[in-house]
Regions:
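Catalytic-core signal marking the mid-to-C-terminal active-site face
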Residues: 223-315
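Structured core elements
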Residues: 19, 82, 128-130, 168-171, ...
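Mobile "lid/hinge" segments at catalytic clefts and subdomain interfaces of large enzymes
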Residues: 74-110, 191-265
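Catalytic alpha/beta active-site cores
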Residues: 1-136, 167-170, 208
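Conserved active-site and cofactor/substrate-binding residues in soluble primary-metabolism enzymes
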Residues: 2-3, 24-31, 61-68, 94-108, ...
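Conserved, well-structured ligand/cofactor-binding cores
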Residues: 14-32, 44, 50-59, 140, ...
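Glycine-rich anion/phosphate-binding loop at the beta-strand->alpha-helix junction
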Residues: 106, 130-225
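Flexible, glycine/charged-enriched surface loops at secondary-structure junctions
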Residues: 115-126, 155-167, 204, 235-245, ...
Length: 315
């Protein structure tokens, strides 16, 4: 927070979207951003990054003053909440579990808005969604496409007009897919993941540095991470076509299957009352999935390049 003013020096806040990530000091960060912005309305897609449910999923507590933060968000023209699927993905959740969690968390925030008299149409504009993107290209494409379909259904049931059933979707390359051994392979993983997120309909993508599992990323890895999205947009033209995977039987089938599985997980969570009440049982199911995946890796039934396949014997 102390370095926020230095970080944003020279940034055109009405042009470049800014999203805060300050879970320990959300109010101080928001107040600092408001002071920097002054009378300027933030660019579309900006947000305060508040995610109390995600913090609960990670075993942390949120003491944010939501009422005061909501007032700042309204003044800045920024989104208040982020619905972050990486909170469960990083613990080993399957794609369906991540979708179910994101839907349930999103509905929880809609209810919080409704408790304060905000209608669903306006409330939906206060949310940003995040999904993890892995090197499993087609499942990642299908997951991003499925979320748009499922959230559209939630908004339909909430009475939101069709033309306003929009979704701001941000992709983050997966942390669990990264390997400490032969970390250069992580560049291939993150490139495929970023490509899949873009093809799946992400509005923006964060590419993690390839050496992040080793500690503080070096300048080369940070530069490569920043440039990956630019190369995919400017040279591969990923952003030129809307839904380029649409119509492909394989992708449509995967999307339908994931949408059904994600909705089933969502209804299972809702049957327990609310995402906060269902979180312990959801995390228990996530742990089971993670345990099975670890066993598959240990038995080489799930190969990892540079680790269990083609390892660098001199590393």
């Amino acid at each position: 927070v102390d370095q926020l003013e230095t970080t944003l020096a020279g940034v055109l806040l009405d042009v470049a979207p800014v999203v805060l990530d300050a879970p320990d000091q959300p109010l101080q960060a928001a107040q600092t951003l408001a002071r920097i912005a002054g009378e300027t309305k933030l660019a579309a897609g900006s947000g305060l990054g508040l995610d109390p449910i995600g913090m609960a999923a990670r075993g942390e507590e949120s003491h944010a003053d939501i009422a005061q933060l909501a007032q700042i968000a309204n003044t800045l023209g920024a989104r208040l909440f982020v619905v972050d699927g990486t909170a469960v993905h990083d613990q080993g959740a399957s794609d369906a579990q991540e979708l179910g969690y994101v839907l349930a968390a999103g509905v929880h925030y809609l209810r919080r808005y409704a408790d304060h008299g905000v209608d669903p149409t306006q409330a939906a504009q206060g949310l940003e969604f995040r999904l993890s993107a892995t090197a499993e290209q087609f499942p990642t494409i299908a997951k991003f496409r499925a979320l748009r379909r499922l959230w559209g259904r939630v908004l339909e049931l909430s009475g939101v007009p069709q033309e306003q059933r929009t979704l701001l979707l941000h992709g983050v390359t997966s942390r669990p897919m990264m390997a400490k051994y032969d970390p250069w392979v992580n560049m291939l993983r993150t490139t495929v993941a970023a490509f899949a997120a873009g093809v799946g309909g992400a509005d923006s993508v964060t590419v993690l540095p390839y050496d992040q599992p080793l500690g503080l990323p070096d300048p080369l890895s940070r530069r490569n991470a920043r440039n990956t999205s630019a190369l995919l947009i400017e040279e591969s033209h990923v952003a030129k076509v809307s839904d380029p995977a649409g119509g492909s039987y394989a992708v449509e089938k995967l999307t339908n299957d994931l949408a059904e599985a994600g909705w089933a997980e969502f209804t299972r969570i809702e049957a327990e009352g609310d995402i906060l009440e269902a979180l312990p049982s959801l995390l228990a199911r996530v742990a089971e999935v993670a345990q099975r995946r670890d066993a598959e890796v240990a038995r080489r039934r799930r190969p990892l390049t540079g680790v269990s396949e083609f390892p660098n014997l001199h590393e």
